[in-house]
Amino acid sequence: MAKKSMIIRALRKPKYKTRQNNRCKLCGRPRGYLRDFCMCRICFRKYASQGLIPGVSKSSW
């Protein structure tokens, strides 16, 4: 329950700009956040491997 309240609190518009927390829009994870995609690294990997993120492909060299 504590995690759910933290997610809801992070999604609300903060009174001050410095109080803003970056959280994944899909799962609410606070760590490993990728700003460009607004999701955590785990969700990014899952959706990128399924091909659901346009312009992202697995790199190989």
Swiss-Prot record:
Pfam families: Ribosomal_S14 (PF00253). Zn(2+) binds at residues 24, 27, 40, 43. Part of the 30S ribosomal subunit. Contacts proteins S3 and S10. Belongs to the universal ribosomal protein uS14 family. Zinc-binding uS14 subfamily. GO terms for biological process: translation. PANTHER family: 30S RIBOSOMAL PROTEIN S14 (PTHR19836), SMALL RIBOSOMAL SUBUNIT PROTEIN US14M (PTHR19836:SF19). One of its GO terms (cellular component) is cytoplasm. Binds 1 zinc ion per subunit. It comes from the Bacteria. Transmembrane segments: none annotated. This is Small ribosomal subunit protein uS14. Binds 16S rRNA, required for the assembly of 30S particles and may also be responsible for determining the conformation of the 16S rRNA at the A site. Keywords: Metal-binding, Ribonucleoprotein, Ribosomal protein, RNA-binding, rRNA-binding, Zinc. Its cofactor is Zn(2+). GO terms for molecular function: rRNA binding; structural constituent of ribosome; zinc ion binding.
